[in-house]
Amino acid sequence: MESGPCSRPAEPRHCVSGRAGAGLAFPAFPLSAAGAEPGSRIGTVAAVLPAGGCGERMGVRTPKQFCRVLERPLISYTLQAMERVCWIKDIVVTVTGENMEAMRSIIQRYGHKRISLAEAGATRHRSIFNGLKALAEDQPGCELTRPEVVIIHDAVRPFVEEDILLRVVLAAKEHGAAGAIRPLVSTVVSPSADGHLDHSLDRAKHRASEMPQAFHFDVIYEAYQKCSDFDLEFGTECLQLALKYCHRKAKLVEGTPDLWKVTYKQDLCAAEAMIKEKISQEICVVVNTKDEESVGHLLEEVLRNELNCIKVTSTVLDRTSGDIENFIDQCYSFICVNVVSSESRETRKLLSILEESSLPLLYPVVVVLVHCFDFTVVPLAQKMENLVWIRELAKEAKGRNVLLSGVLLNHSQDEQKLQESLVQSAAIIAALVKERNSALVGQLLVA
């Protein structure tokens, strides 16, 4: 093992959708350093994602690939992960005829690129075979080029990174077939016909087969063409087909823990938690002054100390400088510190900038308005009454996937009280950023 983890249609199926049109660019998470110019080493690469399942094990009416995670279909996250890899030339998704229009709508809404659709088959292997046919240059009406290497990946494994994709592709380039594996979590047992233990497998000697897998295109395409109806109907392992029909022993590549497959309802919750964690790694503190002694910069320092695992940066809300646009590309959490009377205008300015970007389309964006005043000078009830506009503005913003709420910070002349309020504000902000709870939209929270 390397360290580092379908069906013959009765009639030929046609590629029913060409390349997706131009769409919004994705602000991607940083890619792993898997190699500077991998394309020069691996030739042309395409991917096939079978997405024709019905989600039977999940026990829901909506196929799991179309279930929403943070208001976005799960398959969209997987497509985004594949699209970020610039050396994957084409991505073929196989979906059932009844879900074809829904899939086209997802591609259009979220700006996915390099995506083509093919009709899914009745089984996993039949769906994969249809996807391969769309790349084989033997189907009329298709614009796709026959690749040298093809990746097969599940539409419900959204956290695949470029590093593991490159490692399985390079291994497939050398050996003809390769696949990611992971250690077994539970011991596998074989029951007898009467329901008693027959034998168990040594967990240390066996591995779980995962995705992605990669193949010389000619190898896996030939394997599917030779495949028996029984294998097409009941088989699940692509590596086994390459071994059985083309005598290619796959290279096994140790995968990462995030290759798991969304299978059950609780997996949707786990996927949501992982996505929230990823998009909460950076906070941008928007201030209205460059004065390093301002309460905004003091809050930034407290946030940095309290949330040492999160990157905290600051900028002045000034569209002419272009600074805020630089943060828009990489941040999904904005803390606006207002100490002047123009809070509403400044907030609308930020929301306008966000609306012009693609950020809220892809993930929920958190905006926290921090209002600083001395609680002993301005009565709290009076201040909250003056900020009632936040509730209405938050309702508007929520429709655009922006979660807006407010924090009241005691800008006391007493340094100890000010520090206590700064620390409490940081704790509230951390919870709002990490949880992204829409139930708190429009709320004013007192620190």
From Swiss-Prot:
PROSITE patterns: ISPD (PS01295)
Residues annotated as site: Transition state stabilizer: R57, K64
Bridged cysteine pairs (disulfide): none
Pathway noted in the entry: Protein modification; protein glycosylation
Catalyzed reactions per annotation: D-ribitol 5-phosphate + CTP + H(+) = CDP-L-ribitol + diphosphate; D-ribose 5-phosphate + CTP + H(+) = CDP-D-ribose + diphosphate; D-ribulose 5-phosphate + CTP + H(+) = CDP-D-ribulose + diphosphate
Record keywords, A-Z: Cytoplasm, Nucleotidyltransferase, Transferase
Similarity section: Belongs to the IspD/TarI cytidylyltransferase family. IspD subfamily.
Protein name, entry field: D-ribitol-5-phosphate cytidylyltransferase
